[in-house]
A protein has these predicted regions:
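The two-metal-ion catalytic cores of nucleic-acid processing enzymes
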Residues: 1-248
């Protein structure tokens, strides 16, 4: 997944049902609030909840905010409600992690060896120890950012789940397959910002009334010299279709 500054969709609607320039500005990242100076999710601004929002999930991405020792990941969830309103949810406090065999690291202080390792754990919050499918005790290694997980994993002879993309990690751990319920903690710009461990952040069935907007692209490439390889032949045709406008 990209680490581009994608800030998502606010609720804009023009009189003719199209999408105005304001929405494009939000998608491009030219509008909205970012949190840039605090790492701990518990210290960030979470507005009071006004209820819950259920939405069909259309895309999940992430960005890195802050800098240096204060970098932290933010998961961005995009989707639509049953009323077909677009939503952008910022989830803070999602931990990037992987597992290593406990016997390989039990004599090491990993948080002292690596600045990018924030914590190590051998048990989940309920006290159940982490194990491989063969019953081998595992240690959970929590990194500062997803990038750190990718850089550190090869330092260990054995590791598990280090290749799972960070947005997919969020979906797997929250058991999200189609829909998501979130507490309605809205920032001033209309986006929702929640903690990962919020009890109201849970998977739900997708709202069946939601009509996701799909923009389909298709290209045709000069193939007179055989099957074209990436970047070798010119594009001769580019087609785009918008499912809302039903126009090409």
């Amino acid at each position: 997944m990209s680490e581009s500054e994608q800030w998502g969709l606010d609720q804009f609607e023009s009189p003719d049902g199209g999408r105005p320039d304001e929405e494009a500005a939000v998608v491009a990242g030219d509008a909205g609030q970012t949190v840039s100076e605090v790492v701990d999710a518990a210290d960030l601004k979470f507005p009071d909840s006004e209820g819950v929002v259920e939405m069909t999930v259309s895309q999940v991405d992430y960005t890195i905010e802050g800098s240096g020792a204060e970098e932290y990941p933010v998961v961005h969830v995009f989707g639509r409600t049953a009323e077909n309103e677009p939503e952008h949810v910022r989830v803070l406090g999602v931990e990037p992690y992987f597992y290593v065999p406990t016997e390989n690291v039990e004599d090491r202080a990993l948080t002292e060896e690596y600045d990018a390792i924030l914590d190590t754990r051998t048990e989940d919050p309920s006290g159940e120890r982490f194990e491989s499918i063969r019953g081998e005790p595992l240690t959970k290694v929590i990194g500062q950012t997803p990038r750190d997980v990718g850089q550190m994993r090869d330092d260990f002879d054995e590791h598990y789940e280090a290749d799972i993309l960070f947005p997919n990690r969020f979906l797997i751990d929250k058991d999200v397959s189609a829909g998501l319920q979130v507490p309605e903690r809205r920032l001033e710009d209309g986006r929702i910002q929640v903690r990962y461990d919020d009890e109201e952040l849970v998977a739900v069935d997708a709202p069946t009334e939601a009509d996701l907007r799909v923009n389909t692209f298709d290209i045709e490439v000069d193939d007179r010299s055989g099957f074209p390889e990436d970047g070798e032949e010119p594009i001769v045709c580019l087609t785009s279709h918008d499912s809302y406008d039903d126009e090409y």
